[in-house]
Amino acid sequence: MTKTAIAVFSDPKSGGDEALGRLFNALILTLELKEKSQEVDLIFQGAGTRWPAEIVKAAHPANALYMAVADRIAGVCGGCADIFCAREGAEASGLDLIRNRDVPGTSGVIDLSRYLEEGWRLVAL
């Protein structure tokens, strides 16, 4: 069975359709893999840590899709959320802030290399 980690880096503050498109593609791929009973983790990384505060809103166009894959969301990069001023929104979304890798100048980040070491595919959007 394949294992896929999908990291959302796109920034909702960019104001463009591309960022929203990348989010939708990440959510859709997560849903497709979930429906095929494959192991999949969705991660919010970098400026993408700003998304959780937005997509938990019922009026957001990606909310229904987000809710459909909520059980496959591994969490939000804690150090990234700090750097991109997204910690409060990420915490309010109820998602876990993950800081399992010490990186100088941060409060800790998600260790993406763990996924590669364990044979996961990594998709960055």
Language model: regions and residue ranges:
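Short internal beta-strands
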Residues: 30, 40-45, 74-80
